[in-house]
């Protein structure tokens, strides 16, 4: 009889854990999760990226020594996770809830439905260790001139985060939850978003958008001091660079290769020297 349809699921045996003091462990051994975030697009092709280029991205990550991929900010082509399974790249996947929310039942239900579908569709991939559900959700603040109304908005954001986190833990108790914030420490703590997920993600750009690279290590230490029981990762970091631009005296915003290298050296040294930092993802894998 002819085969009409078939479903193939990967099989992988591994166990892992996050520790707020010691970082990440895979099969009982410490492993610093280092890699990149990834958007699914390519020059002149946009989102219609052919399989060969999808696979090439993951092979590039592996070749540069990466062991972790953050799919940002949405589930991507199934081939990506299939390739991560095959190459031994660990991964997180997230739904597209970015920068702001809509305060409505329809929006909330859509978010919950997206999270449910993402988990059920990808549950069997051994490469996945984390389900995520928000990215920089307080970046574009609403109601800045109306503090009482803004507080109501913050309450809605926190309630949605709690619903998504609780749903995720119920659907898959074997994996971790992640909520990703931009570098506004006081704001996210005030709203209560750092207390909800199992792992907190920070997108940090000290020395690029603001500040100096040396501020980065201070931020890492602050998290460990003020949230000592919560594991965390640096889910984004980086400085824009253009391969055509070189400099003997690199400075911020010159987009030179030299400034980007200096930037990465500071960040990598800070993360690698602190066992409590579970990992770091450069932004972005490919542009």
Predicted regions and their residues:
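Substrate-binding clefts and catalytic carboxylate motifs of secreted carbohydrate-active enzymes
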Residues: 127-132, 141, 148-186, 191-287
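Active-site-adjacent substrate/metal-binding segments within catalytic domains
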Residues: 2-143, 162, 177, 226, ...
């Amino acid at each position: 009889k002819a085969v009409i349809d078939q479903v193939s699921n990967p099989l992988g045996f591994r166990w892992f854990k996050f520790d707020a003091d010691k970082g990440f462990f895979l099969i009982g051994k410490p492993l610093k999760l280092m890699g990149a975030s990834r958007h699914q697009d390519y020059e002149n092709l946009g989102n219609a990226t052919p399989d060969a280029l999808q696979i090439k991205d993951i092979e590039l990550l592996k070749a540069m020594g990466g062991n972790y991929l953050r799919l940002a900010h949405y589930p991507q082509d199934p081939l990506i996770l299939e390739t991560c399974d095959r190459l031994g790249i660990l991964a997180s996947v997230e739904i597209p809830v970015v920068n702001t929310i809509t305060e409505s039942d329809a929006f909330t239900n859509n978010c919950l439905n997206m999270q449910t579908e993402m988990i059920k569709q990808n549950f069997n991939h051994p490469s996945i260790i984390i389900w995520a559900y928000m990215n920089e959700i307080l970046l574009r603040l609403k109601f800045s001139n109306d503090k009482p109304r803004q507080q109501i908005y913050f309450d809605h954001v926190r309630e949605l985060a709690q619903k998504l986190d609780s749903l995720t833990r119920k659907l898959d108790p074997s994996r971790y939850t992640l909520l990703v914030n931009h570098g506004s420490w006081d704001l996210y703590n005030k709203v209560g978003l750092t207390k909800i997920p199992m792992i907190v993600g920070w997108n940090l750009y000290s020395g690029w958008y603001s500040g100096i690279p040396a501020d980065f290590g201070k931020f890492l230490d602050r998290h460990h001091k003020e949230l000592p029981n919560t594991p965390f990762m640096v889910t984004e970091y980086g400085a824009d660079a253009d391969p055509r631009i070189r400099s003997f005296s690199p400075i911020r915003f010159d987009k030179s290769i030299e400034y980007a290298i200096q930037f990465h050296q500071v960040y990598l040294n800070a993360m690698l020297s602190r066992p409590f930092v579970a990992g770091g993802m450069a932004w972005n894998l490919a542009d």
